[in-house]
């Protein structure tokens, strides 16, 4: 039953990381914009 705790942890990590990566990509694109 220990391995069952891995899935919720992955869901939480994904939920936290995905918006951060999206924001970082947005900032990177905005910074690269010559305008």
UniProtKB/Swiss-Prot annotation:
GO cellular component, as recorded: photosystem I; plasma membrane
GO annotation (BP), single: photosynthesis
UniProt entry keywords in alphabetical sequence: Cell inner membrane, Cell membrane, Membrane, Photosynthesis, Photosystem I, Transmembrane, Transmembrane helix
Spans traversing the lipid bilayer: 10-30
Parts forming coiled coils: none
Assembly behavior: The G.violaceus PSI reaction center is composed of one copy each of PsaA,B,C,D,E,F,L,M and Z, and forms trimeric complexes.
Listed name of the protein: Photosystem I reaction center subunit Z
């Amino acid at each position: 039953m220990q391995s069952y705790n891995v899935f919720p942890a992955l869901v939480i990590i994904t939920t936290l990381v995905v918006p951060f990566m999206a924001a970082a990509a947005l900032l990177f694109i905005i910074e690269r914009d010559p305008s």
